[in-house]
Every structure is written in C-alpha cells, then in structure tokens.
C-alpha cells in the first residue's frame, strides 16, 4: 500500500519512501524473454495437460485476440488452482510452479479476487503439511498474489491469514532452508504491500531480524562460522528486513540504527558473496535513513567501516569467481561512495516507452524486491500494475494505440547509431574508472 516518502506511519494514499519517479517516452525497451519459464518442470500427474504448459502457451499466438488469450489463460489457471489440493505432492508442486509463472507474467486481479479464499486455504495446507520445495513454492506464490491483489481488503486478508504460518516456518530451525528462504521473502514483500497496522510491521521486522542477527555475534568471526547451507536464508531475511525499513516509522528507525549498524559490518566478512553484498546494501540503506532523520549524522566507527568497504571494493582474491569479484567491486564502490560522500549513483530501467529512475538505496531495495519475485515480468507489471506504478510514482497506466506505438518506434539504423554511441561512452567511462581504481587506496 502506498506510503509517504518521509512519513512516520503506515497510511493510505501518497507515495512510498524513495521519492518521486520521472517517466519519459523512449525507444523500445528490448526486454528479454522470461528466463523463469525455461525452468518450469514437467510433472506426471492427473492433469498433465495443465502442468506441462508454460506461460507462453497460455498467452497464445498473434492470431488470437486479447479476449481469447485471457479466457484461455483463465481456464488453465482454474486447472492449476484445482490441482493445489491434489493428493500427489508432485502434482501440487507442478500446479504451484505453473501458477507462479503465469501470475508473474500477467495481471489477473479479478480472477484472483473471486478465488482468494480458495487460494488462501490451498496455500495454508501447502505451508502446513507440505515439505521443502512445496512450502517454498507456496510462499513464492503468496508473494506474487500480494503483488496482484495489492493493498486492498482482499490482499490484507490474505496476508493476515497466512502471516503466522510464514513466521512459523521461517522460525523453525528444522524446516528446509529453501522453504525458510522463500518464507522470509514472502513475509517481507507481503508486509510491505498488504500490512496496514504498524504492529504487524514491527513484528515482521523483529522476526526477520532474529533470523540474521545471530550470525552477527560479539566476535568478528561470527559471520564466517555460518554454515554454507544457511547463507541463502540469511541473505533473504536481511533483504526482506531492509525492504521493510523503507516504510518503517522514524521512531523505530532510531532504535534499529543503534542496535544494528554496529553489528551488520560483521557480515562483510562472510564467505558468501551474496550475503556480503546484501549486508553492504543494507548498511548503505541505514546510512540513507539515518541522514534523512539527522542531516549531520556521524557514525562513530566510520574509519573501520570504510576500511572494510574499501577492501571489498578493490578485492582481487583469485580464489573467488571472476564474475563474483567484478559484481562485488562494482556494488561496494557505490556503497563506499555513498557512505563517504552521501551521493547515490542513479540507475535507469527502461520498459516499453517509459523510464524508471532509481536514485536512492531505498528505491533500489524496493525495485530489486519486486524484480526478484516477478523475474522478467517486472517490465509488464511496471507498465500495467497500478500498485507498482503508484509505488514508483509512474502515474496512470499509459494507453497507446498501434499508430502511436508505431510513431514512437525508431528505425533499426537509428537504434544502431544510438547503441554505438552508448557503447563508446560506456567504454570511455569504464576506462577512466579502471585507470583511477588505485586512487581508492
């Protein structure tokens, strides 16, 4: 549900933390095909014709009009929903996966509103009685349902009914780490979208904080002692916690800063590159929130923190994968630049004829959270989902006819010239960065 940029309480209307967005007409985005669809598993079950279909099959060819596509997709979705209560665990898992792929690619609020109670009951049984992968898929579907239903009464009711189960699985040390990971993500996203009570927000923050805080012990080596099997869980819990910080009242932010800012740097020594990056981004977000509360905010252990960030920004250890080293250096250079100077690098996301500008760590965390759950469907939802457009300040959904779209589309030659110029500028910028990388030391 939309929240104010600087607000100290959850409320209806307005805009979320992260500032307003700018949108402009641009060339075709060239969005990639849904990578997640290639991972859809075919499952032997009582309804093989339903579960073997990918999302692209549901969407139909160009010869079929939009109405027929919608009806065809809804018929298949009805079959998926029916299979959620099947006796076979494989059938239920296949139905959950197919449902997840379909809902990430299309917007179907009316269809889901009519079946919200049925879906809630089915997901509750999957979370209660399912094991491992089934629980993980159920939590993933719940996250997408919250995005589809939005902050309205049905979305709030769905999240409230399943929130205790998500917390139960997340807090169960004997549960599958994969299931706990997806429950953490669903808890954070569901609370961000559908929770209306500050107490719900505080309880979710406390639960997520409890998951990763134990790895920030009193000793500096605590993070390195975490089993590799739990790295994904800690990363998901930390990211979900950071997402909820973007809508947390200022009075609570002050206590969280005092409690967590001295402890989070310990996670920078983790063996997991994803956990190190999640910790670095969370630290940058905490600094951003602290400076929002107090413009001349000063962190006591600034020198040691910047030293750790600088080490990761220039890391060249050969035992780490080359791709991981490159990604880590890029992100930690941005984190160090912000912590030291307070300037956040701006990112642009092009979708359709519009552009989304990400100019703060809060907006970065919010966008990444939705992108993680929607995959390449994020572009479709940015164009058509009123919830996301409200969150990022994109305004009403653009309605353009075929003639308008054709008029806006540039020629292949013009696109080639634009890409060539962009490539040249990017090469020059990277060359300068490589030449001066030693200056960080």
Curated annotation (Swiss-Prot):
GO MF annotations in UniProt: ribosome binding; translation repressor activity
Top-level taxonomic group: Eukaryota
InterPro entries: ARM-like, ARM-type_fold, IFRD, Interferon-rel_develop_reg_C, Interferon-rel_develop_reg_N
Any one Gene Ontology BP term: negative regulation of translation
Name assigned to this protein: Interferon-related developmental regulator 2
Quaternary context: Associates with ribosomes; promoting ribosome inactivation.
Pfam family, one: IFRD_C
């Amino acid at each position: 549900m939309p929240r104010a940029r600087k607000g100290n309480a959850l409320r209806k209307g307005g805009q979320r933390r992260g500032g307003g967005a700018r949108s402009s007409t641009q060339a075709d985005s060239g969005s990639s095909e849904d990578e997640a669809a290639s991972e859809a598993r075919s499952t032997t079950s009582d309804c093989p014709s339903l579960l073997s279909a990918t999302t692209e099959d549901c969407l139909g060819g160009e010869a079929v009009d939009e109405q027929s596509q919608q009806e065809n997709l809804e018929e298949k979705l009805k079959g998926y929903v029916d299979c959620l209560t099947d006796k076979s665990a494989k059938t239920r898992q296949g139905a959950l996966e197919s449902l997840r792929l379909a809902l990430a690619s299309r917007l179907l609020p009316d269809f889901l509103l009519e079946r919200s109670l049925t879906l809630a009951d089915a997901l509750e049984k999957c979370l209660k009685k399912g094991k491992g992968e089934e629980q993980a898929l159920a939590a993933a579907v719940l996250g997408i349902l919250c995005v589809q239903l939005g902050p309205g009464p049905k979305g709030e009711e769905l999240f409230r009914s399943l929130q205790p189960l998500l917390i139960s699985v997340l807090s169960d040390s004997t549960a599958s780490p994969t299931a706990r990971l997806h429950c953490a993500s669903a808890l954070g996203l569901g609370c961000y979208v559908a929770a209306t009570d500050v107490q719900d927000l505080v309880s979710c923050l406390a639960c997520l904080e409890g998951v990763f805080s134990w790895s920030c012990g009193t000793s500096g080596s605590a993070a390195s002692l975490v089993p590799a099997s739990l790295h994904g869980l800690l990363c998901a819990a930390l990211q979900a916690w950071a997402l909820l910080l973007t809508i947390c009242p200022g009075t609570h932010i002050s206590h969280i800063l005092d409690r967590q800012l001295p402890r989070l740097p310990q996670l920078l020594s983790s063996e997991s590159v994803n956990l190190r990056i999640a910790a670095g981004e969370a630290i940058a977000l905490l600094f951003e929130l602290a400076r929002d509360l107090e413009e001349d905010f000063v962190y006591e252990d600034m020198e040691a923190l910047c030293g750790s960030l600088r080490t990761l920004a220039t890391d060249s250890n050969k035992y780490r994968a080359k791709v991981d080293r490159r990604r880590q250096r890029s992100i930690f250079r941005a984190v160090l630049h912000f912590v030291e100077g307070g300037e956040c690098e701006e990112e642009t996301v092009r979708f359709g004829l519009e552009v989304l500008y990400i100019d703060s760590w809060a907006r970065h965390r919010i966008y990444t959270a939705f992108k993680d759950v929607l995959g390449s469907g994020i572009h479709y939802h940015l164009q058509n989902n009123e919830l996301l457009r409200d969150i990022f300040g994109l305004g009403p959904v653009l309605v353009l006819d075929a003639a308008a779209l054709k008029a806006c589309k540039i020629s292949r030659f013009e696109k080639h010239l634009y890409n060539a110029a962009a490539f040249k500028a990017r090469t020059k910028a990277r060359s300068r960065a490589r030449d001066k990388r030693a200056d960080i030391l």
